[in-house]
């Protein structure tokens, strides 16, 4: 796995994640729609496409919306973090983040694009996870909050493995 391919994978998958967040925040979301985890096992899907040698897996907009709705439109790092109100639906702006990055899907038999692996974050925390020097602190917190839910979906990852996906 070359450095260039790793860099390309990060860039291409980041673009997919940005497009997902743009799509979910541009649409009107019904706040009253409550989502419950179902623990149905979902096998890894075929890749959406291969671009520039990078395998890209589809992100399901509805699953991201469900995850954000389940958090009651709050940041899962700190529910007191404030966000602006969206024009589209009057709800707080939140971003969906796959705790185990979709770029790692090839390592897992079951889909990573499930609500149990998608966390709701304010822009500040989402950017800190991707670019902050203390991102490992935030990732560790989310890991401990989500590990049991992930296991129910047969998604097994150690904290050390997860941190390595983020470059720690």
Regions found by a protein language model. Name each.
Residues 1-37:
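Internal, Lys/Arg-enriched amphipathic helical interaction segments that engage polyanionic partners
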